[in-house]
């Protein structure tokens, strides 16, 4: 544990929206009188019909979560229309292309027109309130237009990260029975094209075999690359928007109407469709964006995430735009044209607030300080971290080298399921400890529970649960409420279980220690081990597979695969087969799931009842096999000896 304490910077304290006294006062009110607190803050968004009920939640039995349930509003209206009078000519989105010489500024008035046109295109082609629309786009302004257009007409968007494979895209189309897809001819990433339309065509064919028929595909021309065309199905975005009106009335939405589905990995193979609704989600995204980043009107805010992840939903699109902010959207990667790109963008667009992932920071730290110090970064006021715990070394580098010791760091903990940040410092209120997410946001009640379900008080280690609801919380797993209850509420009764381990120190600060279930955190993105295992087993040479994480210097966790082969398959050249399996997993899931280590083994360590002992596999992958713990239930000890002998991570 880091013993260093960084007191609130005088500059941060001077202009802050929330000082420590206010934090303590508000927090106390938020947990002792949630109805009163959230009624007050629920009015930060505009309502067509004001709510009279605030909180109606129960973590027991059938688990119901409702906030502002009789209120009527529209997310797109709150992110655009309500700003037009006072800040119509203010820049809403700064788009920075993959190519450093290409950028675009979109004002709130232009955003209104673009979103209304896209909304009218959706309506023209039969998309109605409640229909699911799949968005498979690169980081271009049209991705934000598409999300806001869906919200405007009451369609439910499902954004799929443009790095996912056709198979992964198809699975997400099928699960929510989406019949309308928005994509691009190609994406551009690090100077290289990404075949999005081709992937979409393949995904649609796969979905059709599972009886889900996509009727229309709206294609944004990004590169002008050659694409195949489905007559009567495929539509060019630029032609369609030219043929419709630039005005579209926002659909009145009940606070509990669905806003979006976003798929996230679980500990079982099939990704879960996390469902977020309208009112509570927007209140929470908007409020956390304002107070965590201490956002002041006129500042330039940049979150480097992709809209394919929840961070992009809440902190590139919905939170900032609900607050009338200027949000920067970056198409590129941190190391193209070179490792100084982030800091060049900061200087070019005078960025004040910068929010990124520890994986990117560790990679940039390894490239050397000169890429940072050659830029001025004089406009930076606040730094943020998201996606995984940040190790103290990377934190110190971020603070000292990137921030020149003048920018507080908000190390934020939250998940797709949470809708917004749950544990975080507030820049003008919280003394910082490198590596700690520090204290809960308003209304959030963290609890540490041991494996037997006993609540731990004071200084403790345990499983991180939240004992009461907050407005941004997911409502269900799309189409599978039973799975929602089983995943999050069955392990510890009456509490939401995050799946993360956590430590609380003597100051009441929280330190996230990583996943405690079979989910990996690769470069800040979640992947279920079961998902990777089923991809491996679908290869004709593989009989069985077990996947675990191990510490990785850049990605946080690496992917270590133990594979047993079909009879006869071991005659192949092992290096060639390894390459083949890596390609196979990339094809099934996407590059994000690329295995780092593959170890071929005659067998896996199992109990006499046939259960794989993953604890042992983790220890071997970490090269820590001296402490394997109790192995008395092992069916065959010889299997473990072979695994140790042939481990891929020998130090």
UniProtKB/Swiss-Prot annotation:
Transmembrane segments: none annotated. This is Acetyl-coenzyme A synthetase. The gene is acsA. One of its GO terms (cellular component) is cytosol. One of its GO terms (biological process) is acetyl-CoA biosynthetic process from acetate. It comes from the Bacteria. It catalyses: acetate + ATP + CoA = acetyl-CoA + AMP + diphosphate. It comes from Brucella melitensis biotype 1 (strain ATCC 23456 / CCUG 17765 / NCTC 10094 / 16M). It is an enzyme of class 6 (ligase). InterPro entries: Ac_CoA_lig, ACAS_N, AMP-bd_C, AMP-bd_C_sf, AMP-binding_CS, AMP-dep_synth/lig_dom, ANL_N_sf. ATP binds at residues 387-389, 411-416, 500, 515, 526. Its cofactor is Mg(2+). NCBIfam families: Ac_CoA_lig_AcsA (TIGR02188), PRK00174.1 (NF001208). Signal peptide: none annotated. Catalyzes the conversion of acetate into acetyl-CoA (AcCoA), an essential intermediate at the junction of anabolic and catabolic pathways. AcsA undergoes a two-step reaction. In the first half reaction, AcsA combines acetate with ATP to form acetyl-adenylate (AcAMP) intermediate. In the second half reaction, it can then transfer the acetyl group from AcAMP to the sulfhydryl group of CoA, forming the product AcCoA. Its EC number is 6.2.1.1. Belongs to the ATP-dependent AMP-binding enzyme family. CoA binds at residues 189-192, 311, 335, 523, 586. Keywords: Acetylation, ATP-binding, Ligase, Magnesium, Metal-binding, Nucleotide-binding. Mg(2+) binds at residues 537, 539, 542.
């Amino acid at each position: 544990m880091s013993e260093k304490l960084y007191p609130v910077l005088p500059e941060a304290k001077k202009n802050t929206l929330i000082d420590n006294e206010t934090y303590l006062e508000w927090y106390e009110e938020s947990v002792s009188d949630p109805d009163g607190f959230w009624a007050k803050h629920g009015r930060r968004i505009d309502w067509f019909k004001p709510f009279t009920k605030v909180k109606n939640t129960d973590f027991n039995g059938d688990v119901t979560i409702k906030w502002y349930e009789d209120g009527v509003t529209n997310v797109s209206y709150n992110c655009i229309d309500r700003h037009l009078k006072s800040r119509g000519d203010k820049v809403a989105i700064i788009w920075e292309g993959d190519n450093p010489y290409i950028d675009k500024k979109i004002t709130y008035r232009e955003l209104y027109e673009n979103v209304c046109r896209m909304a009218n295109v959706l309506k023209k082609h039969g998309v109605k309130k409640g229909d699911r629309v799949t968005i498979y786009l690169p980081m271009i302004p049209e991705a934000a237009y598409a999300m806001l257009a869906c919200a405007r007409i009451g369609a439910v968007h499902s954004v799929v990260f443009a790095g996912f494979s056709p198979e992964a895209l198809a699975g997400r189309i099928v699960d929510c029975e989406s019949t309308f897809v928005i994509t691009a001819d190609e994406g551009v990433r690090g100077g290289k094209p990404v075949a999005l339309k081709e992937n979409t065509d393949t995904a649609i064919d796969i979905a059709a075999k599972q009886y889900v028929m996509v009727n229309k595909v709206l294609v944004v021309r990004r590169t002008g690359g050659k694409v195949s065309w489905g007559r009567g199905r495929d539509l060019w975005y630029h032609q369609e928007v030219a043929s419709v009106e630039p005005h579209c009335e926002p659909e009145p939405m009940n606070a509990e109407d669905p806003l979006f589905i976003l798929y996230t990995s679980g500990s079982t193979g099939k990704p879960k469709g996390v469902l977020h609704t309208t009112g509570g989600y927007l209140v929470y995204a908007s409020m956390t964006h304002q107070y965590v980043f201490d956002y002041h009107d006129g500042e330039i805010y940049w979150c480097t995430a992709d809209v394919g992840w929840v961070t992009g939903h809440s902190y590139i699109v919905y939170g900032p735009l609900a607050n009338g902010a200027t949000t920067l959207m970056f198409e590129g990667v941190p190391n193209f044209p070179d490792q100084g790109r982030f800091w060049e963008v900061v200087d070019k667009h005078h960025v004040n607030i910068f929010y990124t992932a520890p994986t990117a920071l560790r990679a940039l730290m390894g490239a050397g300080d000169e890429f940072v110090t050659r830029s001025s970064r004089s406009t930076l006021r606040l730094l943020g971290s998201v996606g995984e715990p940040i190790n103290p070394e990377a934190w110190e580098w971020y603070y000292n080298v990137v921030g020149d010791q003048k920018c507080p760091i908000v190390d934020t903990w939250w998940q797709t399921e949470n809708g917004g940040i749950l544990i975080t410092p507030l820049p003008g209120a919280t003394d910082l400890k490198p590596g700690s997410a520090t204290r809960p946001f308003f209304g959030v009640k963290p609890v540490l529970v041991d494996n037997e379900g006993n609540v731990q008080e004071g200084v403790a280690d345990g499983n991180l649960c939240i004992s009461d609801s907050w407005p941004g919380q997911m409502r269900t797993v799309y189409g599978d409420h039973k799975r929602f209850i089983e995943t999050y509420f069955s392990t510890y009764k009456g509490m939401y279980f995050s799946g993360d381990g956590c430590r609380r120190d003597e100051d009441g600060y929280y330190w996230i220690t990583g996943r405690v279930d079979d989910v990996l955190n690769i470069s800040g993105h979640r992947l279920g081990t079961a998902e990777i295992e089923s991809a491996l087993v679908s290869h004709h040479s593989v009989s069985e597979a077990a996947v675990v994480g191990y510490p990785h210097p850049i990605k946080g966790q690496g992917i270590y695969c133990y594979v047993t082969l079909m009879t006869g398959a071991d005659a192949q050249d092992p290096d060639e087969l390894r390459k083949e399996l890596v390609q196979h997993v990339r094809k099934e899931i996407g590059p994000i799931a690329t295995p780092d280590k593959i170890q071929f083994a005659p067998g896996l360590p199992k109990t006499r009842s046939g259960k794989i002992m993953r604890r042992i596999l983790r220890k071997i992958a970490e090269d820590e096999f001296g402490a394997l713990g109790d192995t008395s239930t092992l069916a065959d000890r010889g299997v473990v000896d072979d695994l140790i002998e042939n481990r891929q991570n020998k130090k």
